[in-house]
Amino acid sequence: DYLYNEDRSSDYRHLNHILAAYLGYTLKYKDFTFKPGVRYEQTVQRVKYIVGPGENFHTNFSDLVPSVSLGMKLGKTQNMRVGYNMRIWRPGIWNLNPYFNNLNPMFITQGNSNLKSEKSHAFDLSYSNFSAKFNINVSLRHSFNNNSIENISRLITAPEGEMFDNDPTHIAPEGALYSTYANIGKSRNTGMSLYLNWNASPKTRLYVNGRGNYSDLKSEAQGLHNYGWNGSFYGGVQHTLPLKIRLSLNGGGSTPYINLQGKGSGYYYYSLGASRSFLKDERLSLNVYCSNIFEKYRSYNNHTEGVNFLSKS
């Protein structure tokens, strides 16, 4: 049995409306293709609390997103492309929700309903070669962002604690770790990615997908700076046996990712699968799949560091 506590509830209705308009143009001349374009997006979010102490809020985002690319055909199967685009990342409800979550009074979290869309500017240069037996795509990319949304944690050091939102019920005691979000980050990322597919025989296919990236993250307002390398890899082999049974062996992983106040956890995985299709046009498929079968448990480690505190989980 349990007793329902409305004061601890965060039951709300979230409405998210996105309107968009697109404009693009393609110009071709001999082996060159030029594509400028622009997209406008209007986002309206409304949150209304049904049960609980949370406050209703609404927020709007207006974003103009340009892009441009120049492609060049090098041969029948080869292409090169250079381009620029701006990407936006709208904060989700978990970033925006101002609910003061002090279920654990020593680890308090709260969203920020004043967040703005995160805008990232990216320049890329890519080469591709696609043929019947061999496919490859190599891309070099640099991006920067001057208003990235970062999770910020700080230790409450005042002996009397600290009050938030001018609400006497929103008190973080001395020694508590308070976390929220803010558009305070500046990031610079340079990386390379590789996709490779080789049809070694009519029944065997090998594929590799990998990337490496160097990140430099900074918040001058908070006096924070972090940088480092991150890489990920995915690859596998697929082979067709008699009776049209397809076997696949896959594996991959990633090194720890870098954030403004520390780093996340690296990981790896592996899997084995078998499949068989039936009926006309192979409309029915039977699949058997297993992954990480030699491990009962997995651990993931996160490292967060700030003024006067160090958190590991």
Q: Which residues are covered by each model-predicted region?
A:
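Residues on the lipid-exposed face of transmembrane beta-strands in outer-membrane beta-barrel proteins
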Residues: A21-L27, V68-M72, L125-N129, L140, ...
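Surface-exposed extracellular loop regions of Gram-negative outer-membrane beta-barrel proteins
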Residues: N16-E55, F61-S67, G71, K76-H121, H142-E174, W198-Y214, Y257, ...
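C-terminal beta-signal and adjacent terminal beta-strands/loops
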Residues: F278-S313
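Transmembrane beta-strands of outer-membrane beta-barrel proteins
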Residues: D1, F34-V38, P66, M80-V82, ...
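Outer-membrane beta-barrel strand-turn architecture
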Residues: L27-D31, L64, M72-K76, I88, ...
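Outer membrane beta-barrel strand-and-loop segments of large Gram-negative receptors
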Residues: L3-L15, L19, Q110-N112, K116, ...
